[in-house]
Amino acid sequence: MARIGDGGDLLKCSFCGKSQKQVKKLIAGPGVYICDECIDLCNEIIEEELADADDVKLDELPKPIEIREFLEGYVIGQDTAKRTLAVAVYNHYKRIQAGEKGRDSRHEPVELTKSNILMLGPTGCGKTYLAQTLAKMLNVPFAIADATALTEAGYVGEDVENILLKLIQAADYDVKRAETGIIYIDEVDKIARKSENPSITRDVSGEGVQQALLKILEGTQASVPPQGGRKHPHQEFIQIDTTNVLFIVAGAFAGLEKIIYERVGKRGLGFGAEVRSKAEIDTTDHFAEVMPEDLIKFGLIPEFIGRLPVVASVTNLDRESLVKILSEPKNALVKQYTRLFEMDGVELEFTDDALEAIADQAIHRGTGARGLRAIMEEVLLPVMYDIPSRDDVAKVVVTKETVQDNVLPTIVPRKPSRTERRDKSA
């Protein structure tokens, strides 16, 4: 295509009939011309049709029970967190739907505000995986950001707007679709300020980042550099409204349980008070009793906590839960490795005590569910190296001794076929 400038015969738009002098730009195709005004009109029509399609999707939003049931198929345990997330996500997208209808009818009686989510719990217990599975179910753009890489504007590091760029990229640069996506910010406990009292010196990677995140968490029209990095005065920006972006902010918050225990322990004073030992509190979900004052003591600023009204906590996974994670979900590790061995024509089997031994190792290492794959790789590496070059193996059996004592898995040889036996005897 060629742009038509001034000079020569007076050309007209093939759609609206305006001459090239009446419009800013006239673009030529094979025998036709279109002006910039008609292009803008076409874009508006397409955007309206896409918005209608999005409304249909919101009308079909699954109910909280359906969301929880979907999560059950992929994530073991963490029932309280699943319920909390299911309700929060359902209400969030219902709020978007109400906003769309209210904008069309101009008489929405109540303005519904956003409820972002704070997830607390040890590493390797499913926080990230829960958020990923939710986004997968809802078919919305999803981006993960690391809070430790962020710094306040003007300092070395990433600006908070780069988080929004990841979401836009996940939506294939469809800004309208990105505006209803989910952003998961991990390691948020690492941006806690260094002390409970405000510091005189700048805390550019702690309190400064919390301050910078406030606006996008609440909802604002943000300017995002299309290539990431720092903003430059002469570059064009992508404008994105974060009002309908759901933020799930998560962290391990190591040490927060001590703050909670100090506060909860004070209840056990005076006659008739319920006294609980530290061991009794530790066996329960201590994060379930978290209060805003605990998070402020930990180092989050009150304004930041106020923008995260929904709190979901995950608990440490015990041996039983880890064994279930290995074998029960739709994409369980045992099923994945069984499929890999099937592709080489070999059956793979884990004994029950082998799965328990793998779970025990993950608990011992303190890596939770995240460490299960590494242990499986260590256990299966010798046979995964050897078996593709062999044609005499029918089955591999992984036992408790294989996991605990580094003994090679039991290899069951394949019985030769009649043809092979006949050829051998000949």
Curated annotation (Swiss-Prot):
Entry keyword set: ATP-binding, Chaperone, Metal-binding, Nucleotide-binding, Zinc
Ranges where the ClpX-type ZB domain occurs: 1-54
Database matches in SMART domains: AAA (SM00382), ClpB_D2-small (SM01086), zf-C4_ClpX (SM00994)
InterPro entries to which the protein is assigned, alphabetical: AAA+_ATPase, ATP-dep_Clp_protease_ClpX, ATPase_AAA_core, Clp_ATPase_C, Clp_protease_ATP-bd_su_ClpX, ClpX_bact, P-loop_NTPase, Znf_CppX_C4
Binding-site list for Zn(2+): 13, 16, 35, 38
Binding site for ATP: 122-129
Recorded GO CC terms: HslUV protease complex
GO biological process, one term: cell division
GO molecular function, one term: unfolded protein binding
Transmembrane helix as UniProt keyword: no
Function field: ATP-dependent specificity component of the Clp protease. It directs the protease to specific substrates. Can perform chaperone functions in the absence of ClpP.
NCBIfam families on file: clpX, PRK05342.1
Subunit and partners: Component of the ClpX-ClpP complex. Forms a hexameric ring that, in the presence of ATP, binds to fourteen ClpP subunits assembled into a disk-like structure with a central cavity, resembling the structure of eukaryotic proteasomes.
Family: Belongs to the ClpX chaperone family.
Alphabetized HAMAP family for the sequence: ClpX (MF_00175)
The protein, known as: ATP-dependent Clp protease ATP-binding subunit ClpX
